[in-house]
Amino acid sequence: MAAAPGLLFWLFVLGALWWVPGQSDLSHGRRFSDLKVCGDEECSMLMYRGKALEDFTGPDCRFVNFKKGDDVYVYYKLAGGSLELWAGSVEHSFGYFPKDLIKVLHKYTEEELHIPADETDFVCFEGGRDDFNSYNVEELLGSLELEDSVPEESKKAEEVSQHREKSPEESRGRELDPVPEPEAFRADSEDGEGAFSESTEGLQGQPSAQESHPHTSGPAANAQGVQSSLDTFEEILHDKLKVPGSESRTGNSSPASVEREKTDAYKVLKTEMSLDLKTKFGSTADALVSDDEATRLVTSLEDGFDEALDAEYYPMEEEEEVEEDADSSDELPLLTFSDKDEKVPGKPMIEKYLTDKDPNLSEEDKVEPPTWGDAFFSIVTGGEGKPGVVDLERSIEEEEDVSVSSSHQRKPQPAAGYTDSEDEGDDLFVEEPKTNDVKDSETDPELVITGEEKDIQESRKGLVQPESQSEDAKSETASAYRLQGSKLNPLSAAEKGRDFTLKAVFEKKENGLKESVIHISKETLHEDKTREIQRDSLESELVHRALGSSVTENNKPKSLGVAPLLGNNKPDASKDSTEVPDGSVSGPKAGQQEGFLEPGLKTQHQPRFSPPEETGPSRELGGKVPISGRNLSWQQEQDVAAVVGKHANEKTGFPEEESREDGTDAEQARAIRRPQEAESPEVLSVQPGRPDEEEEEEEGDNYPPEGLMEDENAVSAQQSRENSPSARDGRSDMNSQVFEKVILGTLNLNTEKTKQPANMILETGQESETTSEEAGDVGKESGHSVVVDSEESHLADMRAQRPSQVHGLRDETAAQTPGSGEAVLSKNPNDLQKDNPEEELVNTLGLEDPGVGEISEGEPEDTKEFGVSESQGTDAEDLRDDPSRQATPEIPDIVLKSIREDLPIINSFFKDDQQSLHRFLKYFDVRELEGLLEDMSIRLRSAHQNSLPYNMEKVLDKVFRASESRILSMAEKMLDTGVAKNRDLGSKESSPLEEAEVLDDIQDLIYFVRYQYSGVETAPLVTPPPPEEGWARPGEERQPPQQDSLPQENTGDLSVQPPEEPELSDQPVTSVQPPEEPELSDQPVTSVQPPEEPELSDQPVTSVQPPEEPELSDQPVTGYTSTSEVSQKPDTKKDIDLGPVMEGGPVGAGDVQKQLETIAEEPAAVPPLESAFGSLYAFILYLSKMLLATLPDNVQPGPDFYGLPWQPVIITAVLGIVSFAIFSWRTILVVKSRVYQVTEKQISEKLENIKKENAELMQKLSSYEQKIKESKKYVQETKKQNMILSDEAVKYKDKIKILEETNVSLGDKAKSLRLQLESEREQNVKNQDLILENKKSIEKLKDVISMNASELSEVQVALNEAKLSEENVKSECHRVQEENARLKKKKEQLQQQVEEWSKSHAELTGQIKSFEKSQEDLEIALTHKDDNISALTNCITQLNRLECELESEDPDKGGNESDDLANGETGGDRSEKIRNRIKQMMDVSRTQTAVSIVEEDLKLLQLKLRASMSTKCNLEDQIKKLEDDRSSLQTAKAGLEDECKTLRQKVEILNELYQQKEMALQKKLSQEEYERQDREQRLTAADEKVVLAAEEVKTYKRRIEEMEEELQKTERSFKNQIAAHEKKAHDNWLKARAAERAMAEEKREAANLRHKLLEMTQKMAMRQDEPVIVKPMPGRPNTQNPPRRGLLSQNGSFGPSPVSGGECSPPLPAEPPGRPLSATLSRRDTPRSEFGSLDRHLPRPRWPSEASGKHSASDPGPAPVVNSSSRSSSPAKAVDEGKVNMAPKGPPPFPGVPLMGGPVPPPIRYGPPPQLCGGPFGPRPLPPPFVPGMHPPLGVREYAPGVLPGKRDLPLDPREFLPGHTPFRPPGSLGPREFFIPGTRLPPPTHGPQEYPPPPPAVRDSLPSGPREEAKPASPSSVQDRSQASKPTP
C-alpha cells in the first residue's frame, strides 16, 4: 500500500497530463469541432469526391464505415480539431471519417465557408442518437485503432516483420500509428531497451558505443514515432478507460480492458502503490511484483534516468518516450511505460523487466542483470511472445552453452534483440522485430553468436539443433530488432551499441550466458513482442492486472520474500525492478530469482539483459514463471517468481540466502516450477509477495510509483548483483542454460499451442510454437512436452500455449516455464548443457520423455527428476542421458536469418517453434511454400479489402479453400520427396508421426495465413497439429511424469511441496496450457498450496490439447486477456478460457483443451456475464485441480478416463447428477411438498370460495339470461318495425320508379327542345360571325390598301434618295479620279525636276573634281620642281666640294695623274675628274628629272583613273538612284492604281449595298403591305363579327321579347283554362249537388221501399262515411282513404266548391289523367279569387290534404267538381265525371307544360301528370325534371318570369305563396315527399311560383301550338302548381 499515495499523485499528474499533444481539445463540448467548412451556407453542396484508401469502421454511429475503394462524397469538413474529420456519405450512410483515409479525386467547389458547428451535427445521422460519452475525436479514433490494432497487426504480422527488417522504426511507426497498443508496447519495449541500453552504457561506460552503433540514428525517429504513437495511445487509453469491459475483451483484451483494470486498480491502489513504490525497497519490490505495469512504467522511467546518466541519445529519446508515454498513458508523463504498459501490458512487462534490469545493470552490474533479465525476458517473451521466448530460450540454451564459452560474443545480440524483445512480446509485432533489429541482431548475433551458437547448436543438435539454431538466429534477430524496436529504433540502435558494449561487459562479468540470454531474449522478446506486443501488451496487461492483482494479493506474502530479490533485477519496472534488484543485488541468487521471476512475471516486459548467471536459475524459474508470467500478468510473473523463490527455498530446502544467491536461482526456479507447473497460480501466489496493492498498483498506478520503484529496484538489483556475482555467474550460467532449455521446451509447448491461436495469437503462437517445438525437443520433454516426444511436446505446447495465448500467452509461458524452470533449477546449467537439458528438464519437470520412458505418473522418476532439478546435477545428468530430450534440433542462425528475411510467413508461424520449423525444413521447400503462402496472403488481403462485410467470410473462405488445396497438394508432393531426407536427418519422432505433424503444420500454417485476414477475429486460426502420439503423450505422459516428479520434488528440493512438485511437473504440461496456469495464478492468491500444482499437471494435460489453443488463438486477444483477466477478473473472457482449461486440467487434458477451444471461441464476444461465468468456471476448475492435486500420485486421475477426455466425462456426470437431482426434486420432493402444502382448512376455504364464486356466477347467468330475453324482445320489435318500414319502402320505391320514368321522359323532351334551340342559336351565331368577318375583312382590305399606298410612297421616296446618294457617290468618285490624275502629273513633273537637278549636280561635281585634279597636278609639279631644285643644289654643292677637294689635293698630289677616280678609276686630271663628276651629276639630275616626270605622268594617270572611277561610281550611283526613283514611282503608281481599284470596288459595293437596301426596303414594304392587308382583313372580320353579334343581340332581344310575350300569352291561356276548368268544376259541382238533391228526393219517394233504401242508404253510408271522415280532415284524405275511394269521398268533401280547390288527388289516384286536370285547376288562383272565400277557405284545407297525399292541389278544381257531385249525388258519378273532366282537360296539357319546365312541358305533362296524380309522388318527378332536368338557363328564364306570375297568383292564397318558394328546392322537398309525409309540404308549395316560370318558357319553346295555347293560360299558375304540388305532395 506504500505506493498508493504515489499512485494517487501520478493519477493527478496524469489527469493534468491527460491533455496530450495528440489529444484533441475536449473543450468543444458536445461537438467534435466548433467550426465546419462547407461549400455553401447550408452545407448541402458537395465539396469533394474521393476514394477510400483503406477500410474504416467508426467507433460509433456518428462515423461512416467504408471499405477500401469505396466512393466517398464529402459535404463538409470540421475545422479546428487536431485530427481533421470530414463528413460525407458512402452509398446510403452518412457520417464522419478521418480525411487521411480517402484520396480526393474531384473537387466540386473552390469556395469554402467557415460555419459554426451545431451539436446536432454530431448526433447519429440515422436515428438521431446523441447520448455519447465522448466527443474527443482522437480518443474515439484512438480507441478504434486500439481495438483494430491487434487483429490488423496479426494479419499484417508477417508483412510487418518484413518491413521491420527493412526499418523497425518505420514498422514501429506504422504499428504505433494504427495500433496504440503496439505503440504502448513499443514504448515499453523502448523504455526497456532504454533501460537496458542504459545499463549497458553504465556497464560499458561508453555512450559512444551506443552512438557509434549503426542504429543509434534511429532513436529520434523512434522517439518521434513513439511520441505520436503515445499520443494516440493516450487518447486510446482515455477511450479505453471509458470502454466497457466487453469492448476491451473483444479488443483482444486490448489495452482498453487492461486500461480499465489498471484504472480500477489504479484508483483503488493509487495511494498504496505510490506509497509502496516510493516507501521502501521491500515494498517497492512487492509493488513492482504486484504492480507489473506500474513497475514497467517506473522502470522505463528509471531506464530513462539511467540512460539520461549515460547521456547518450537515449536520454532524449527516452525522455521523449517517457513524456509521450506519460502523456499518452495519462498516468505519468515521466513513466514511459504508462501508455505502453496500458497498451501492451505483456510487452511492457517484458520491457519493464528488461528496463528494470537495465537500471539495475546501469546502477550496479547492468551487464549481468540485463543479460539475466534478457534471458528471463526472452523467456517471458516466450511466454509473452512465444516466438520470442522460444528464440530466447533456444538462444539462452545455446547461449548458455555457448555463453559459458563465448557469452560475450552474443552480448551484442541481446543488445540488438533487446529492443525486439518487446516487439516480440506482441505476437502481432513479432514480425516487426525481424526488421532492423533482427538484421542488426542477426548480424551482431551471428558474429557474436557464431561460436556460441555452434556450441549451443552442437549441444542441442541432439535435441533440436536446427530449431535451436533457428531460435538463436531468431533470438539474435529478435534481440537486435528488439533493441531497435523495443526502444523504437533509436533505442534499438543505442542498445545495440550498448549491447556490443554490454557484450564486452557481460563477457568481462562472465555473463556470456547472460549476454546470449540478453541477445536471445531481445531477439525472441522483440519478435515475440512484436507479435505479442499488441496481444501480450493487452493480454499481459490484463493478465498482469487480473492475475497480478489476484495472484499478487494472494501471493503477496510469498512474493515478498522473493520479490526483493527479484526487485533488484527489475529496475525497469518498479515492481520488477524492486524484485529484481534484490535478486540482482544478491547476485546470481537475486539475479536468478529475478530472472526466473521476471521471466514469469516480466516475461513480456523483462529486458533481454537478465545476467546469464541469473539467467540460468531465473531462466529455469523464468522458464516456468516467465511463461506463466506471460500468460499471467507481469505482476503475476513477479509473484510467481517470488513465490517460486520462496517455495524453492522452502521446498527445495535451500536456505533463503542460498536460494537468493545460487540456491535462489535454482530453488526459486524450482519453486517457481512447482507453483507454476503444479500451480502457476502458486507461482503467482509465491509472487503474492507483491501485495494485492502492488498488483492493483500495477494495474492502476503502475506508472507513477514505478518511477521511485525503478530507482530502488535498480539500487537493490545492483546491490544483489554486486553481492553475489560469482554465485550468479555459476548458477546463472547453469540455470540460464538449463532454464533456456526448459524455457525452450516450455516455449515449444507454448509455441505449439500458440500456433493455433487467433491471427494475433497465431503469430505469437506460431513463433512460440517454433520455440516450443525447438525448446520442446530441447526442453519440451524436460519441460512438459519434453517428456513426450518433441512432437507431443509441440502439440502439448500448442495446446497449452494456445489456450494460454488465448487466455494469455504469458500465462502459458509462465505455466510452461515453471516446469522448465524447475528442470533448469534442479539441474546445474553445466549439467543441463552437458546432458540433454531437455532430459534433465523433463526429469526436473517430472515430464516423461517420449524416448525415456513414458514415466508413469506414479513412477518416482518424476520425483527423481524433481530431485535432480533440486539437486540440479542429477536432473541435469538425466537430461543429458535422455537422448530424446536432447533430440531437439537446432537450426543455424544463418538459416534462421534467411528464414526471417525471406520467409516472413513461415518465420512468423514457426518463430517460437524451432523443432517444428526444423521438421518443416526437413520435408518441404520452404521458399516455394512461402511463395504459395504469400500468393494466398495477397489473395486473401485483396479479398478482405474488396469484399463487403456481410460476405467477407464467404469470399475469404473461397480464396482460402482454393489456395489450401493447391498448397496441400504441393506440400504432399514435397513431403513425398522430403520423407527420405527427413529420414536421413533422423527425427526423434517416428517419421510417420513427423509426416503427420508436418502436414498438420502445413494446415496450421495455411489457417494461420487465412485468419490473418479473417473478418471474425475470434475464428479459430489454425487447428493445432493432430495430437496423435504428441497429443496423447503430452497429456498422458506429462501428467504421469508430473505426478512422478511431484513425489520426486516432494522428496527432493520440493519436498516442502510434494503435491505441488508433481503438479509442477504437470504444470509443464499446463505450461503448455499457460491459460490454465494463469488461472491458477489467478487463483494462486487463493491457494498457493502445492495441491494446486497437481491440478496444474491436470491442466498441463488439458493445455496439451492444441485445438483449444487454436480456439483461444481464435480469440487471441481474448486469450491473452483471459489469462491476465482470469487471474485478475474471473468475469473476463480470459477467465472463461482459463476456467475451461483448469477444469479440463483435472478432468483430462483433452477435456480441458476442448474447453479451452470452446472458450477460446467464445471469449472474443464474451460479455461481462459470460466472463463472470468463465471466472466462476475457472475457479471451480482451480478448486477441483487443487483437490486433485492433494490426492496421492497413485490415486490422481490420469490424462483421460479410459480413453475419454475428462472434461466430457465430468460434464456428463455432473449433468447426470444435476438432471437426476432435478428429476427427483420435481417428482418425489414436489409431490410430498404438495401433499403437505394443502390442509383441510385450506380445502374447506377453497370450497367455500368456489361456492361463492358459483353463486355469483349463477346470478350473473340469470342476469345475462334476462338481458338475453329482453334483447330478443327488442329484436322482434325491431324486426316488426323493419317489416313495416320495408313495406312502406317498397311502396315508395314503386312510386319513385314511376316518377323517375316520367322524369326521364320529360327530360328527353326537354333535351330535344334544347337541342333545337341550340341548333338554331348556333346557326344564328354562325351567320352573325360570317357577317362580322366579312365586314372586318373589308375593313382590313381597305386598311391594307391604304397601308400599301403609304408604303409605296415611302419606298419611292427612299429610291429617290438612294438615286441621289448614288449620284453623289459617282461625282465624288470622279473628283477622286481627277485628283489622282493631277497627283500623277505632279509626280511626273517632280521626277523630271529631280532628274534635271541630278544632271546639273553631276556636272558640278565633275567640274569640282577636275579642279581638284588640276590643283593636285600643280601641287605635284611644284613638288617635282622643288625636288629638282634640291637635286641641282645638291649637285652644285657637290661640285663645289669637289672643287674644293681638288684644290686642296692639287698641292698634295702634285700632278699625280695616276690618282684614282672617285669611283676607283684612275682619272686623269682634275679637270677631267670634275667634268666627269659634273657629267655624272648632270646624268643624275637628268635621270631624276626623267623619273620625276615619269612619276608625275603616272600620278596624272592615276588621278585620271581615279576620276574616271569616281565618275563611274557616281554614274552608277545616279543610275541606282534613278532606278530607285523609278521603282518608287512604280510603287506609287501601283499604290494609286490599287487605290483606284479599291475606290471602284467601294463604288461597286456601295451599289450592291444600295441594291440590297433597296431590296430590303421593298421586302419591308411588301411585308408591311401584307401585314396591313392582314390587319384589314382581321378588322373586316371583326367588324363582321361585331355586326353579327349585334344582329344576334337584336335577335336575342327579339326572342326574349317574344318569349316574354309567349309567357304572357301562356299565362293568360293558362289562366283562361283555369277559369274554364273552374267553371266546369263549378258546373260539375252544381250537377253533383243536383244529383244529391235528386237522391234525396228519391229517398223520400222511396220511403216505401225502406229495405231498398236501407240497402241503398247502407251502401251510400258506406260510401259517404268515408267522405265524411275525409271532410273533417281535409289534409288526410289521401293518407286515410285509398286514392280511388278518396275521389268520391274527397270530392264530396271538396264538394262545397270545386273551384275553391276540391282535391283531384283522390280522383287522380283512381285515374291519373284526373290529376292533370286538377293540376290545371290548381292554377285556378284567379278562379279562386273569383270563388272568393270558398276558394280560399277550401283550398287551405285542401292544400294540406293535397300536399299530404298528392299534388292534387293543382287539380282541385275538377276534383272537387267530381267529388262534390259524388258527394251530393253519388260517388260513382262524381268519379266518372271527375275522370272524364280531368283526363281530357286539365291533365295532359297542364302537367306537360309545367313539368317540362321550358323545353317539353306539354307532351310530357300530358302523360306523366296522370301518373303523378295517381300517386302522391306524382308531382315530385315533375319538379325534379323541371329543376334538375331543366337546365339552369332555360329553367331560370322560365322560372323568372313564371315566378312573378306565380307570386301574382299566390298572393290570393298566402299558403300557396309561401310554399311556392319551397318548390324551388325540389330535391329537399322530394325526400320528404317520398316518405309521404302528408302535411310536411302543403299544396301551397306545389302552387309555388316555381311552376309558373317553367311552364311559360317550356310552352314557348317546345310545346306544340295547340298544347301551348292550353298550357299558356294554365301554365303560369296551374302548371307550376302541379309541378310544385307534385313536389310537395309526397
Swiss-Prot record:
Segments of this protein annotated with the region Proline-rich domain (PRD): 1776-1930
PROSITE patterns: SH3
Residue ranges of coiled coil: 1236-1329, 1359-1422, 1514-1662
GO molecular function: cargo receptor activity
Comp. bias intervals (Polar residues): 197-211, 247-256, 715-726, 1040-1054, 1115-1127, 1677-1694, 1915-1930
Quaternary structure (record): Interacts with MIA2. Interacts (via SH3 domain) with COL7A1. Interacts with the COPII coat subunits SEC23A, SEC23B and maybe SEC24C. May interact with APOB and MIA2. Interacts with SEC16A.
Known function: Plays a role in the transport of cargos that are too large to fit into COPII-coated vesicles and require specific mechanisms to be incorporated into membrane-bound carriers and exported from the endoplasmic reticulum. This protein is required for collagen VII (COL7A1) secretion by loading COL7A1 into transport carriers. It may participate in cargo loading of COL7A1 at endoplasmic reticulum exit sites by binding to COPII coat subunits Sec23/24 and guiding SH3-bound COL7A1 into a growing carrier.
Protein name: Transport and Golgi organization protein 1 homolog
Gene designation per UniProt: Mia3
